[in-house]
Each structure stands twice: as C-alpha cells, then as structure tokens.
Amino acid sequence: MEINSAALSPAEQALRDAALEYHRSPVRGKIAVTPTKPLSNQRDLSLAYSPGVAYACLAIEQDPTLAHDYTARGNLVGVVTNGTAVLGLGDIGPLAGKPVMEGKGCLFQKFCLLYTSPSPRD
C-alpha cells in the first residue's frame, strides 16, 4: 500500500503526521527493554550481573524449571513477521512491518502482562 500524499485529505494528512511523530518521539519506536530490578548502586549491579548472576545461572543449570523463577522466560513472547501479510498493507517486508509488531507487543504488555522480544531479523 503506497501512500500518495496528494491523495490524502487534510484529516488524513494530520493523522499521518501525528502517527509518524508518535512513532518517532520522544523515544523512537514503541517498545523498550527496561530493568525490573533497581540498578541504583554497585550492590544492585553486582547482583544483576557479575558476580551475582552466576548463582542464578548455576541454579538453572541444576534445575531448568527455575528459569521461570529467575528470568523473564515465563512472561516473554516473541512477535515475528516475514512481512508478507501485515494488517491491510500486504507484502511490505519485515522491516516495514516492524511498527505493527511493536504495536502488538504494546498490546501484549498492556493487557496480558507479557513482554515482547523484538525480532532479531530486521
């Protein structure tokens, strides 16, 4: 679906401009990876990463079911597209379909408390 700016009504142009600005500012895109734990001092950083993270890794190595306790695995989903059937836009490719995938991620987070992992294939 190609957008011909000349064919847009003033209301459609205003919506297009608002939508593009919405996706661009203040931070690009609609999803982000944010910590669920405080990272306000050296102790927090030592628990979140090295050396503290090793204990979570070793516990999961001994009992893989603990991954649901010590990681986001239990509430993390992937949203992936090959871009061949994106909403009513048709075959626009995976990169152009990324805003739709981010939008789905926002809905999952808002209404299902599930967090999305961006597609590694941009």
In which residue ranges do the predicted regions lie?
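Terminal helix/beta-alpha structural elements that buttress the NAD(P)+-binding lobe
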Residues: 11-38
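An N-cap/entry alpha-helix motif that binds or orients negatively charged groups
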Residues: 28-69
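Structural signal for hydrophobic packing residues in well-ordered secondary-structure cores
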Residues: 49, 53, 64, 84, ...
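Short coil/turn connectors at secondary-structure junctions
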Residues: 73-76, 112-114
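Conserved small/polar residues in nucleotide/adenosyl-binding loops
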Residues: 115-122
